[in-house]
Amino acid sequence: MPPAIQCLDSSRYFPKVKANDHINLTIEPHQIFGLLGPNGCGKTTLLHQLQGLDAPTSGAVKVLGLDPRRDRQELMARIGTQLQEAQVIPRLKVIEVLTTFGSFYPQSQDPMMVLESVGLAAKAGAFVDKLSGGQRQRVFIALALIHNPELLFFDELTSALDPQSRLKIWDILRDLKAAGRTVILTTHSMEEAQTLCDRIAIMDAGHIIAEGTPDELIDEFAQGSTLKFSVSGTVQPAPLEKISGVTSVDIQGQDVTVIGKGDFTPHVMQVLTDQHVSPAHMSLNPATLEDVFLHLTGRSLQA
């Protein structure tokens, strides 16, 4: 089985912008793959090439072993993409929208079965413009699934949704992966990427600057977990700095911050005991993908 996606030294240049610059990326099938990066980093340009809407200036891209431009008609029957809200007629019923879109394909699934899979069977007779934001997003997922594609592209699928709606969509994406599909997910939510994605590529300024599993990226690029506490006495920093795995110690008056990798907290506690200092208001925050992105780019993803 070929990779779901291959970018082979692909670049896309515009007169004054290198939107994609020498992209090399292989995405294996049957996983949720996250594509992260700030606005303007080149994600949309890359997605357009993968969907056959544009072609690289140099290099090549392959999707399911096909050339997205040359083989676009064949590819469209095998991939599903998320529509934007303006592309759906609001005064149609949900079942009518799915039936209409299903008619565009030589083979499509039963609309009610698809609605059942996204938890919207009870809304089949509802008008699209009467649905909640989370329900409309599930309609868009159903439309992407109507022809039973192997590969799915979703762009900011849960942005602006309430937590309950977001969790429902996360469950749907997990079900799609369990059913053997490949999902390409672009998101600004580091929590979403860390929770859902098997592998992640981080883009910035037209380049892929890191790629791996969430744990691999955190282990390689994040400074580590952050331990914060306050003290009533004086803490000598040198013994804390010598603890294996500790990468940073910052003491501001009574507030102490220790950053490190591995299980360094018990050793910090021992140092405090040896110095006859009792910590208070202690909190431990594990390293996250947000820390990785900040380390790699010097800014948060929301910036």
Q: What is each residue range found by the language model?
A:
Residues 1-11, 299-303:
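ABC-family P-loop ATPase nucleotide-binding domain
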Residues 79, 173, 221, 296-297:
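Hydrophobic aliphatic residues
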Residues 5-7, 12-205, 210:
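ABC transporter nucleotide-binding domains
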Residues 14, 102-105, 221, 244, ...:
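A broad structural signal for alpha-helix termini and local helix breaks/kinks
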Residues 171-259:
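ABC transporter nucleotide-binding domain
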Residues 223-299, 303:
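Short, charged/small-residue-rich alpha-helical element at the C-terminal edge
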